[in-house]
C-alpha cells in the first residue's frame, strides 16, 4: 500500500510528442536492494485492462523511448518498433518496463556469481558486483508491482528480459539466475569480453568465467529461448572471440530452435543500430 501511494504521487506521463502508445514514468522507484531510480512502463495505444499482456523488462530505461533525454540523442525506438509489430499482428501484445540505470551501471550489470571464479588481480581493487542485488530489485520489487498494477501474464512463458552491452550481460545472467521468472532473454551486443572501464588488465579470465557460468546454468529446455547478436564496429568488434565461444558452447547443448544468434557487419555499439534490428529479437521472443 505504501509503495503504491509513493509511486502514484511520483508518476508522470511521457512526452506524448515522442512516444507511440502510452508511457508512464515512475520517478524514484524505491528499493531495499539498490538505489532508487525511474521505472518507465510502456503500454500499447489500445491497452485494455480486460486483456492479458506479455511483459519485456529492459535495462537502461532512459534510452528506450525518447532521444531528447538521452546522452547521445539516440534511442531504441522501442515504442515505435513494438507498436508496429503489434499492429501488424507479428507478435503478441506486450508491455515494456524500462528500468533506468544508475551511476553503478557496470557493477549492477555485472554477474555476481562469477566473481569468486575470477583470478585474483583481474578485477579492479575494491570492485564489488551489485548484479544479484539489482536482479532482486527487478524480480522481487518491480515485477510484483507491475503484475499488480497492470494486466499481465505473470508466468515465465510470457515474461522476458532484454538489454544491450552490459545490459545484455545482465539479461543473460538473469535468464540463468531466474529461469522460473524469465522464459526468454534478448542480449544485443552482449558485453561478453567483460572489459572493465576502470582497469587496463586483460579481462579474458573474467569472460571465461562468465561463459562457464552460462554453460553450467543455461535453462536449456524447450520452454526457454535466448537471443544474442553483435556488430563488428567500435567495441562490438572486441566481442568476436568471446561470442564465438558462447555460440560453440550453446551449439554443444543441441538447443535446436531455442537459440538465435545474428551477426550484423557494419553495425556498431549504439542505440541507432540496436533500434534498426530490434524487431528481430522481439519477433523471436513474442512471435505468434
Enumerate the predicted regions with their spans.
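Intrinsic-disorder/low-complexity peptide segments enriched for small residues
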Residues: 3-5, 21
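C-terminal motif of bacterial Sec signal peptides marking the signal peptidase cleavage site
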Residues: 7-10
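Non-catalytic cap/lid and distal C-terminal segments of serine-dependent acyl enzymes
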Residues: 13-288
Amino acid at each position: 500500500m505504501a509503495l503504491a501511494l509513493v509511486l502514484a504521487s511520483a508518476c508522470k506521463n511521457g512526452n506524448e510528442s515522442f512516444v507511440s502508445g502510452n508511457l508512464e514514468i515512475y520517478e524514484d522507484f524505491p528499493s531495499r536492494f539498490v538505489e532508487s531510480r525511474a521505472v518507465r512502463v510502456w503500454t500499447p495505444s489500445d491497452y485494455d485492462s480486460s486483456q492479458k499482456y506479455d511483459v519485456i523488462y529492459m535495462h537502461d530505461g532512459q534510452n528506450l523511448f525518447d532521444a531528447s533525454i538521452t546522452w547521445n540523442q539516440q534511442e531504441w525506438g522501442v515504442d515505435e518498433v513494438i507498436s508496429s509489430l503489434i499492429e501488424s499482428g507479428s507478435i503478441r501484445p506486450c508491455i515494456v518496463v524500462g528500468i533506468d540505470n544508475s551511476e553503478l551501471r557496470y557493477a549492477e550489470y555485472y554477474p555476481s556469481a562469477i566473481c569468486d571464479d575470477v583470478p585474483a588481480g583481474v578485477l579492479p581493487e575494491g570492485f564489488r558486483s551489485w548484479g544479484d542485488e539489482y536482479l532482486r530489485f527487478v524480480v522481487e520489487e518491480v515485477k510484483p508491482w507491475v503484475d499488480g498494477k497492470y494486466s499481465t501474464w505473470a508466468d515465465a512463458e510470457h515474461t522476458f528480459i532484454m538489454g544491450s552491452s552490459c545490459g545484455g550481460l545482465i539479461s543473460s545472467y538473469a535468464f540463468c539466475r531466474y529461469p522460473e521468472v524469465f522464459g526468454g532473454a534478448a542480449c544485443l551486443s552482449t558485453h561478453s569480453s567483460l572489459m572493465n572501464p576502470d582497469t587496463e588488465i586483460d579481462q579474458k579470465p573474467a569472460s571465461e568465467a562468465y561463459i562457464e557460468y552460462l554453460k553450467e546454468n543455461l535453462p536449456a529446455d524447450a520452454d526457454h529461448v535466448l537471443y544474442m547478436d553483435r556488430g563488428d564496429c567500435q567495441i562490438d568488434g572486441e566481442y568476436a572471440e568471446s561470442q564465438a565461444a558462447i555460440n560453440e558452447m550453446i551449439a554443444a547443448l543441441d538447443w535446436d530452435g531455442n537459440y538465435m544468434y545474428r551477426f550484423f557487419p557494419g553495425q556498431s555499439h549504439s542505440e541507432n543500430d540496436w533500434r534498426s534490428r530490434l524487431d528481430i529479437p522481439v519477433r523471436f521472443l513474442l512471435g505468434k
